[in-house]
């Protein structure tokens, strides 16, 4: 039996990108939820290079009397997961909860995650009930979740929900990983001995629009595929072999038909030859693109540039910047 350590301090990590409309309500509701815990807490808000007034509002919130808010300002936009990792590097709690700033996942669910973590779980995930997203987002999410489950063997139902709780040793383990492309829920489950999911409410977005454009979703998909496994590279080799065998077989067939039916038939098959040629060329480009994605990520890792740069940290105990 493993010793279960009770949670003494909770750190809530929230990435913020152009969320000035939702910030006042986010801070109020998150603070109220944390106060109901009866434990020490801190709320870390990471500004991910916002172009609106979000950064200024975060600084004011940290400097308010009696504040529990730590504001971390990044110099530019690095993406949701990099911003969360920046928050992880400044937490002081022994249980860390991540939460989106759009209020689609209610902060009022925080006490339930803390209570479940107190049962001895390393990671507490969540599954969104009655999800209030578009059909495209929900369908894409289901496909990605199935891909992750088959690849990792972890029966987690909703990897896309960022309302999650992590024990401190899990966060420390993730901080020791230096890959540039990080998908936090998957990375955490690699180190977790005990993980569980609980159902949570999901609300419509009240302010603004989703920051995940179509291209950002495509980039996220590449992050998932390349950080999970090298299986696509093996599949690429298999596909190349199939195409090579198929091309050779078609060539033999064309020679036989040419000898059997004469040159007139061959002339009439020109368009079919072009169609086959373009099919093979397209398959080659797909394979080259996938291979290039892996090589590009290797190049990024070799350069060893930091995944984020923290410009300022404002803590409630002092108005001085770190």
UniProtKB/Swiss-Prot annotation:
It is found in: Cell inner membrane. One of its GO terms (biological process) is response to antibiotic. The keyword Hydrolase does not apply. It is an enzyme of class 2 (transferase). It is a multi-pass membrane protein. Pathway: Glycolipid biosynthesis; 4-amino-4-deoxy-alpha-L-arabinose undecaprenyl phosphate biosynthesis; 4-amino-4-deoxy-alpha-L-arabinose undecaprenyl phosphate from UDP-4-deoxy-4-formamido-beta-L-arabinose and undecaprenyl phosphate: step 1/2; Bacterial outer membrane biogenesis; lipopolysaccharide biosynthesis. One of its GO terms (molecular function) is phosphotransferase activity, for other substituted phosphate groups. Residues 257-269 are periplasmic. Belongs to the glycosyltransferase 2 family. The lineage of its organism: Bacteria, Pseudomonadati, Pseudomonadota, Gammaproteobacteria, Enterobacterales. Its EC number is 2.4.2.53. The gene is arnC. Its main location: membrane. This is Undecaprenyl-phosphate 4-deoxy-4-formamido-L-arabinose transferase. Catalyzes the transfer of 4-deoxy-4-formamido-L-arabinose from UDP to undecaprenyl phosphate. The modified arabinose is attached to lipid A and is required for resistance to polymyxin and cationic antimicrobial peptides. One of its GO terms (cellular component) is plasma membrane. It catalyses: UDP-4-deoxy-4-formamido-beta-L-arabinose + di-trans,octa-cis-undecaprenyl phosphate = 4-deoxy-4-formamido-alpha-L-arabinopyranosyl di-trans,octa-cis-undecaprenyl phosphate + UDP. Residues 1-235, 291-322 are cytoplasmic. The chain crosses the membrane at residues 236-256, 270-290. Keywords: Antibiotic resistance, Cell inner membrane, Cell membrane, Glycosyltransferase, Lipid A biosynthesis, Lipid biosynthesis, Lipid metabolism, Lipopolysaccharide biosynthesis, Membrane, Transferase, Transmembrane, Transmembrane helix.
